[in-house]
Amino acid sequence: MKKHLLAVAIAALAASSAMAQANDTLAKVKSSGSITLGVRESSGALAYTLGDGKYVGFHTEMAENIVKDIQKQVGAANVAVKYQPVTSQNRIPLVVNGTVDLECGSTTNDLNRQKDVDFANTTYMEQVRIAVNAKSGINDVKDLNGKTVATTTGTTSV
């Protein structure tokens, strides 16, 4: 019973912390009149740059629609949108330190990241694959033992 109460208390504390962060962000947007979107420059159809500070893609457009809702929530006639390019390596730290208010890229929602940031509902799922030379003899992930593998820092692809 005590463990159950402790679990409920921890869950309530986590929920109140997330709500406080959301309220802090809304207050920041209301007082500054702007919001900063963390955008990927080359994340396939989800988020990419057209150059000259213009960003498009499924998640970018979704975030811009969220900004319209935020604008209504804070009672602002207009909320200026600033775009901050982010990478796999810096996207989570920039949300945590407040440089970015909302990141709109191809970021995996996992338990480790949930310790630092809150996620919206999942909107896209994919499966990571590997590519090797057909003559390499590598047919499965276990065949990579002892081999050099390249990946991007800050991703969940490995």
Predicted ranges, named:
Residues 1-20:
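Gram-negative bacterial Sec-dependent N-terminal signal peptides
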Residues 22, 32-103:
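Extracytoplasmic small-molecule ligand-binding "clamshell" domains
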Residues 23, 43-45, 52, 114-116, ...:
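Generic secondary-structure boundary/loop-capping signal
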Residues 36-45, 55-71, 108, 126-158:
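Bilobed "Venus flytrap"/periplasmic-binding protein-like clamshell domains
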Residues 76-143:
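Acidic, polar ligand-binding/catalytic clefts
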